[in-house]
Amino acid sequence: MTFNPGKKLYISDVTLRDGSHAIRHQYSIANVQAIARALDQAKVDSIEVAHGDGLQGSSFNYGFGAHTDLEWIEAVAEVVTHARIATLLLPGIGTVHHLKEAYEAGARIVRVATHCTEADVSRQHIAYARELGMDTVGFLMMSHMTTPQNLAVEAKKMESYGATCIYVVDSGGALSMQDVRERFRAVKDLLEPSTQTGIHAHHNLSLGVANSIVAVEEGCDRIDASLAGMGAGAGNAPLEVFVAAAERLGWNHGTDLYTLMDAADEIVRPLQDRPVRVDRETLALGYAGVYSSFLRHAEVAAEKYGLSTVDILVELGRRRMVGGQEDMIVDVALDLLER
């Protein structure tokens, strides 16, 4: 397709959802309002708000949040005037009832997330979101785990259920730039021209920004990113870095770079109890193709059982574990202990 460098990119911030993983879902109300105010002032298009694992993610399996999803959403709704509030729903964790509550609290966009080969389970939630009048997005996680052609078939299912935008989601931060290019070409070949596409990158191989740029070159409309890369694993594509790169490329991003830079360093980075960066453990996620939010859980298991976090993560990758199988991390640790 012909690349249009002048089109307005849709900047989708995920600091208050994916970023929640980086601090074990412990954002205070004051934290979320300070971050949301800065993002709103910088004129991002949307701000995603939820537990890291989406609506109703607060649980023994994923980690309990400092507040409920609704408390966080309502807090953000009080302070934003420009950005629209988005939320994330994983069918089986959140239900249509939780989605309605999120809508009533102020969310107007929902990203319905499934494993990249399980779009079928999103039908009810996508259809219901459309009934509510929400901007409805299909979110295909762990997109490195299937072929571009299969990914396109799953994307087409989500489109048929009513999603008007489909995301290629690199949950493991394992995609190369060529991988991204091939997936966008396959997906866009099957989808209607009116259906938008989005990229959600992770930075585990330091390719978060590069992969987002490649996606835009392939006609991607929406770009997920977070302040200071705040997110699972080595984090997401850092928002201020992507915007600076887009500015250098002459792309129309519509946001204020300096406001984003200040918010990243002054508000977000000080909250990190573990640096969000590429290091031995987060690099193992990208190398082994492991769901990025497994990081903190694997670190806890490694400390408890006297193991190497890297060994646990690489074994999880070998077993092709996917999002939602956090309970298997301890099983893997116990198996490694017996070797």
UniProtKB/Swiss-Prot annotation:
Record-level GO BP terms: catabolic process; L-leucine biosynthetic process
Catalysed reactions, as listed in the record: (S)-4-hydroxy-2-oxopentanoate = acetaldehyde + pyruvate
Xref: InterPro entries: 2-IPM_HCS-like, 4OH_2_O-val_aldolase, Aldolase_TIM, DmpG_comm, DRE_TIM_HOA, PYR_CT
Pfam family, one: HMGL-like
Site (Transition state stabilizer) residue list: 17
Class of the enzyme per the UniProt entry, highest EC level: lyase
Domain of life: Bacteria
EC annotation from Swiss-Prot or TrEMBL: 4.1.3.39
Domain Pyruvate carboxyltransferase: from-to ranges: 9-261
Alphabetic keyword roster: Aromatic hydrocarbons catabolism, Lyase, Manganese, Metal-binding
Active site (UniProt): 21 (proton acceptor)
Residues the record lists as binding Mn(2+): 18, 200, 202
Gene Ontology molecular function terms on file: 2-isopropylmalate synthase activity; 4-hydroxy-2-oxovalerate aldolase activity; manganese ion binding
UniProt keyword annotation of Lyase present: yes
CDD domains, sorted: DRE_TIM_HOA
Binding site for substrate: 17-18, 171, 200, 291
Family named by the database record: Belongs to the 4-hydroxy-2-oxovalerate aldolase family.
PANTHER family reported in the protein's UniProt record: 2-ISOPROPYLMALATE SYNTHASE 1, CHLOROPLASTIC-RELATED, HOMOCITRATE SYNTHASE-RELATED
Entry protein name: 4-hydroxy-2-oxovalerate aldolase 2
Record lineage: Bacteria, Pseudomonadati, Pseudomonadota, Gammaproteobacteria, Pseudomonadales
